[in-house]
């Protein structure tokens, strides 16, 4: 069940931007023991959003909306989170949908 706080304070993170896989590209990792997990997620592309923008102001900066196949390596996540800096090795390239839509 989705925690109630997610409706007012959604879970978000900023990942590295090393590029994306194509929609049909294979997901290649050194070992399946890393715990490969695929997650369908929504991607929102914005232009420059000013710091401290309200949700209403930020919504005016949305340029594109699409789907992304987010790839996680579950076996690496606990150790990374324990370091206090978030995801890096546990988040390889994700696969971007071939189509994005304007809002």
Predicted segments, located by residue:
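Glycine-enriched loop-and-adjacent helix/strand subsegments that border the catalytic/binding cleft
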Residues: 1-103
């Amino acid at each position: 069940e989705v925690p109630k706080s997610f409706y007012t304070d959604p879970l978000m993170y900023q990942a590295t931007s090393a590029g994306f896989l194509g929609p049909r590209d294979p997901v290649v990792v050194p070992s399946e023991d890393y715990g490969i997990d695929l997650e369908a997620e929504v991607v929102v592309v914005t232009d420059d959003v000013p710091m401290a923008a309200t949700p209403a102001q930020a919504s005016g900066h949305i340029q594109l909306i699409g789907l992304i196949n987010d790839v996680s390596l579950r076996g690496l996540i606990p150790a990374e989170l324990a370091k206090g800096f978030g995801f890096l090795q546990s988040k390889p390239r994700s696969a971007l949908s071939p189509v994005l839509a304007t809002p």
